[in-house]
């Protein structure tokens, strides 16, 4: 009887049907409709420093970022946009606050899209007609980016604070102004630093419009805290089919935002998984140093892009079962390790040879996958108990 690997299902299970939304184009990247959920980030450089900004965009691109946003608070930043938009490997979105003149500058510069904050752009409502015409003439989508920290004063007076209702109403009101001028090439975000408020705001928004939605928890915090907040909020929404593009906001290097974003999508089967290391958290039953073993295997397989699940287990309780369900695995104990490939034990090796053997077998499987034309995903590492 042929063993079947349960590690990487060919047809991943989805938690809910995707919300039906209109599709827009942010450069070559489709957002909304049936397009895959994309991952984006924002540069931390001064946009006027063209070299540093393009270098950071290159690093983000290499990490899997699909869309990048750049700040544009000054005229020097606006002057840099044409070069950055032209030389960037991925679509560039200009992030505009306060000054409407920079919206027009970004459109003229050839940015793939422009984010506007209706809560703090001077006389924004009066400028919508001009912005809509310029954007339409250039084929430039507009992201209406509502943020709890800069909500329109009229809505703060009405609701008293940035409630889910206030955030959704602000976005829909501004979208309606663009619609009056026959402009619907729009995506929307309603960000809050509280995941519960943010989730409810997006739920309300999703029920009232068909625009693609950009998910984000604003000011999420340092890497650990921000990762938890974003994972909780995005998981709640994406599992209900809500969300078309995501940005994980972290007080950390932008590349870390991409790593977290990709992991979230992989965890929800919204993206092809890459390398996945499944390792037990260790306990008193463990007969090997699981931490060290997992770290060494991870380091040895760094950069592998085929969808391969490798189980590194430290005892006989869950070890054999987890190892059998992975594409490749080891169940350790009594100074040795049983090596499993596709559910079958292929050999038993001394503890000192476990890492070397796992890496060798992983390379063989990866080589065969590549010959078979298996689509590669983004490398990832996860820990399971």
Swiss-Prot record:
Record-listed E.C. numbers: 1.17.7.3
Primary enzyme class: oxidoreductase
Reactions catalysed according to its record: (2E)-4-hydroxy-3-methylbut-2-enyl diphosphate + oxidized [flavodoxin] + H2O + 2 H(+) = 2-C-methyl-D-erythritol 2,4-cyclic diphosphate + reduced [flavodoxin]
Gene Ontology molecular function terms on file: 4 iron, 4 sulfur cluster binding; 4-hydroxy-3-methylbut-2-en-1-yl diphosphate synthase activity (ferredoxin); 4-hydroxy-3-methylbut-2-enyl-diphosphate synthase activity (flavodoxin); iron ion binding
Residues that bind [4Fe-4S] cluster: 280, 283, 315, 322
Superkingdom: Bacteria
InterPro entries, alphabetized: Dihydropteroate_synth-like_sf, IspG_bac, IspG_bac-typ, NO2/SO3_Rdtase_4Fe4S_sf
Pathway field: Isoprenoid biosynthesis; isopentenyl diphosphate biosynthesis via DXP pathway; isopentenyl diphosphate from 1-deoxy-D-xylulose 5-phosphate: step 5/6
Keywords: 4Fe-4S, Iron, Iron-sulfur, Isoprene biosynthesis, Metal-binding, Oxidoreductase
Keyword Iron in record: yes
Family assignment from sequence similarity: Belongs to the IspG family.
General function of this protein: Converts 2C-methyl-D-erythritol 2,4-cyclodiphosphate (ME-2,4cPP) into 1-hydroxy-2-methyl-2-(E)-butenyl 4-diphosphate.
Protein name: 4-hydroxy-3-methylbut-2-en-1-yl diphosphate synthase (flavodoxin) 2
Organism this protein belongs to: Streptomyces coelicolor (strain ATCC BAA-471 / A3(2) / M145)
Underlying gene: ispG2
